Amino acid sequence: MEASSNPTTPTTAVATTTSTSSPSPAASTSSKGHSQSATASASASATQSQLLTTSLEMPKTEDLYNLSVASGLSEGQRSLSGAPSASSSPIMSPQGKIFGRNANGTMITTSRPGNEAEVQLYRVLQRASLLAYYDTLLEMGGDDVQQLYDAGEEEFLEIMALVGMASKPLHVRRLQKALHEWANNPGLFQGPMMPHLGLCETPPKPALIFNPDTTPALPRQKFPSFNPSGSSFMPSPVPPAPLPASASVPAPTVPLATQISCPSAPSVPLPLVLPPNPLTSSPHPSANSNLPANTAHQVSSSSPQLTPVLTEAQIQRITMCADKIGRQLPQREPRAQTTRKRTTRELEQVIAMGEQDPRRMDEIRKYSAIYGRFDCKRRPEKPLTLHEVCVNEAAAQLCRNPQTIWLLTRRDELFPLARQIVKDAGFGHSASIARYGGLLTQLPSQGAGLGGGRAPGDTDCESSDAAVPSKRQRLSSTEAAQLPLDLNREAVEDSRYNLFAMYQKFAKPPFDLSEIAKFSVSKAADYEDNDSRFSFSNSSSPTMPTPCNGMEGERSPVSRQMETSSPPRESVDLSGTSSGAALSGVQVISAAGDNIIAVANPALALSPALNEVLALKRSAASPET
């Protein structure tokens, strides 16, 4: 009795909890024959031995009973993190578990931090959305964040391999970014654990089953599209129940224990899903009707990372082009794998997954990645470019179709198809991706769009032809308020574009010289002599392939002037004929029959020297009267 009333005993509260199961007679007998100080020390040592014996001899049924809350969490959430389960740790005490919320909104059950170093590690992993690795790092003594930050490249990769993060380069990159933030501003990762961090300690006997159907959505401002009751995190395809109307906007101070439904009688501790409570559910299912179907993808893409993230419009564009190419591919069997690796078995499991499996798209993205795959030798700190992200997304969308999922085993055929999809979608390089990303947002506001009278969703995938009018409009949309130098440069760009298009059309015989009138220079006149000094005669024109009819390639302006000054042999000045009015901008210097030998560069039309030479040639070619 004296030992129980002694205030100096450090573990009095714990001793009262365990004394009911295995009381210690040694502590009571020793307290009667010794002094007050000896009684306190003896009772403390006896209590510690009781705790050690109880923790080592705990039956398996009690372990399963206490871990029911951790097993009741959705397996879809743990599969998204890709980390080992936190409830499988052998050193974790069921009484010290808490629910932690990652930065991307996922709930993870971890052990409660006990000191300042563990709090810093917890906050760093929470900032990187990697709380699933918290208990694994504690098992290996990784509670020193400074040691992780100061580790060299080989040592850091070895630690990542021991933790199980080496095969997930995106997780490694997020951890490195969080460590750099911790080094730059350590004040954000210090301080006691506050309730606003989304933590809730588990009861000593957590005979509760987490019910995602009756759990209202927590108030979140940074990620409004995330909802823990969505069907993307369900372990089985169970239709989601409507959210209660009274609990749609709960108070921030409501503990998590009120959001976990408790059964009325003791049941088997399995991760069962209870039916929704008819007393609290509302017959209006409008609170959950506007959730997107790809909630898991939005959660993963909102995590802090250095790799660019595609917008929904860009993903929709790539998906449309992938479906178009996928319909043209034959249905084949997956290639037989000869190696007995673990990835081979996992790949077969991914191919056998059903279309309703919430993990299917994430696993397809994992194994269909062309750049930065989990088993590649790419450096983790080297982020992917926007083009590489597009190629990876195109490969994933192409393998999403059950008819073309066999491409997961034929990466040599998947790579060129993915690049073709990106090219058809108009995402050939980063500049076109950024430009087309802004163009897609303007499509609903335009009446006709790129496809004339078609809807924006029916735009043809061959966007190279559709982007030509916008490019030409961008080149020729000069306002009168611009400077004369800008006007001159814009005119030269238009002239070169028209000349290049003309050569493309008339590179192969037979010709129709009457169609040359379609290519006219719009800004080839009304310029002063001062502006004509900005001539681009030294710049190279577009190189054209030499046709089979022996047409000469591009020649310098000096050679053209030498030819025009020589006596015309079989030259025909088409500008002096009756169709000269139609041929307003293009001047044919020399031609033999229907074959054009030399055409004046429209960019040099501003030069007075060339105009004088052409005037002399025109007067020499005209019949004498």
Curated annotation (Swiss-Prot):
Alphabetized UniProt keyword annotations: Activator, Nucleus, Repressor, Transcription, Transcription regulation
GO cellular component: nucleus
Disruption phenotype: Larval locomotion defects and early larval lethality (L1-L2). In the CNS, axon outgrowth/guidance and glial development appear normal; however, a subset of eve(+) neurons forms in reduced numbers.
Domain of life: Eukaryota
Biased composition (Polar residues): 224-234, 284-305, 558-568
Places the protein is found: Nucleus
Bias kind Low complexity: ranges: 79-94
Tissue expression notes: Expressed exclusively in a subset of neuroblasts in the embryonic and larval central nervous system (CNS), as well as in several larval imaginal disk tissues. Co-expressed with sqz in a subset of neurons in the embryonic ventral nerve cord and with rn in a circular domain of the distal-most area of the wing disk.
UniProt GO BP: locomotory behavior; negative regulation of DNA-templated transcription; neuroblast development; neuron development; regulation of DNA-templated transcription; wing disc pattern formation
Alphabetized Pfam families for the sequence: NCD2 (PF04905), SAM_NCD1 (PF04904)
Spans annotated as Disordered: 1-47, 75-111, 220-247, 276-305, 447-480, 532-578
A single GO molecular function term of this UniProt record: transcription coregulator activity
Stretches the record annotates as NCD1: 111-189
Induction info: Regulated by vestigial (vg) in the wing.
InterPro entries per record: NAB_co-repressor_dom, NAB_fam, Nab_N, NCD2_sf
Region annotation NCD2: where it falls in the sequence: 340-427
Described function: Transcriptional regulator that can both act as a coactivator or a corepressor depending on the context. Lacks DNA-binding domains and acts by associating with other transcription factors such as rotund (rn) and squeeze (sqz). Acts as a coactivator of sqz and is required to limit the number of neurons that express the LIM-homeodomain gene apterous and to specify Tv neuronal fate. Acts as a corepressor of rn in wing development and is required to limit the expression of wingless (wg) in the wing hinge, where wg plays a mitogenic role.
Subunit field text: Interacts with sqz and rn. Able to bind mammalian EGR1 but not Drosophila EGR-like protein klu.
Domain topic, free-text comment: The NAB conserved domain 2 (NCD2) is necessary for transcriptional repression.
Protein family per UniProt: Belongs to the NAB family.
Name under which the protein is recorded: NGFI-A-binding protein homolog
